[in-house]
């Protein structure tokens, strides 16, 4: 793939053989962003698990203290009073059979979903559409619930879901390049703590194998996966 001049210039500032501290990586990500807008900062983590085995699946939710820098669009499957509760909490799309039908026709203009338990039989009809996109409501992540208002408010406030893919990778947005160093590091710390907390007992060997920071359309920055504490401390030059 042919890279842009801006991308190549940014990549020259990064030593691919070095493992940067998270703080240095955040600063490099901001410095090497190649977009004219505030780019998204994403973290890719390679885990030492075999996702093909049910007892090594890694998934969960985390409340990022500073959000992602984006107000996610939330679709809610609910009816009656619960639909009204969802709307009052700030849900962007609320429906039941009608919302299922729209999604079957190709509508996917939302970032997260929530459903009341009584709606799940209907939502099951579009599981093949929502599931592969990580959009299927799930009681384990608090998105199948009767407390619709809180679920919507949590997502709007920075709660994100994560799930390991078939290759053992996790991708998490920790903010944008206009965030402060501290905001990005605190979001990363919150995500990392939760990922470590849900480590499967069946996972053997090294759990955090590889960590990479990157901005939208920017080069990857290798990060030391062993740096998991006191991340706001200045790094010590080697």
Curated annotation (Swiss-Prot):
A Pfam short name: Ribosomal_L1
A Gene Ontology term for the protein's cellular component: large ribosomal subunit
Molecular-function GO terms, alphabetical: rRNA binding; structural constituent of ribosome; tRNA binding
Keyword Repressor attached: yes
Keyword line: Repressor, Ribonucleoprotein, Ribosomal protein, RNA-binding, rRNA-binding, Translation regulation, tRNA-binding
Gene3D superfamilies: 3.30.190.20, 3.40.50.790
BP term (GO), one: regulation of translation
Subunit note: Part of the 50S ribosomal subunit.
Its biological purpose: Binds directly to 23S rRNA. The L1 stalk is quite mobile in the ribosome, and is involved in E site tRNA release. Protein L1 is also a translational repressor protein, it controls the translation of the L11 operon by binding to its mRNA.
Family: Belongs to the universal ribosomal protein uL1 family.
Protein name: Large ribosomal subunit protein uL1
Species annotation: Frankia alni (strain DSM 45986 / CECT 9034 / ACN14a)
Taxonomic lineage of the native organism: Bacteria, Bacillati, Actinomycetota, Actinomycetes, Frankiales
């Amino acid at each position: 793939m042919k890279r842009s001049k801006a991308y190549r210039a940014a990549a020259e500032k990064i030593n691919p053989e070095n493992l940067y501290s998270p703080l240095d990586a955040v600063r490099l990500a901001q410095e090497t962003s190649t977009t004219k807008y505030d780019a998204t900062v994403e973290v890719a983590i390679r885990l030492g698990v075999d996702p093909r085995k049910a007892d090594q699946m890694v998934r969960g939710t985390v409340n990022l203290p500073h959000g992602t820098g984006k107000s996610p669009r939330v679709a809610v499957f609910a009816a009656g009073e619960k639909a009204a509760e969802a709307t009052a909490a700030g849900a962007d799309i609320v429906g039941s059979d009608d919302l299922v039908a729209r999604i079957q026709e190709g509508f996917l203009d939302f970032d997260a979903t929530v459903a009341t338990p009584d709606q799940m039989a209907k939502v099951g009809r579009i599981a093949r559409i929502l599931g592969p996109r990580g959009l299927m409501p799930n009681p384990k992540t608090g998105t199948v619930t009767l407390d619709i208002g809180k679920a919507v408010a949590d997502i709007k406030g920075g709660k994100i879901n994560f799930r390991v893919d078939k290759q053992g990778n996790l991708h998490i947005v920790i903010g944008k390049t206009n965030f402060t160093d501290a905001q990005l590091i605190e979001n990363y710390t919150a995500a990392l703590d939760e990922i470590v907390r849900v480590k499967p007992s069946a996972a053997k060997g090294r759990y955090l194998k590889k960590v990479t920071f990157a901005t939208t359309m920017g080069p990857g920055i290798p990060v030391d996966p062993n740096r998991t504490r006191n991340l706001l401390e200045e790094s010590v030059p080697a």
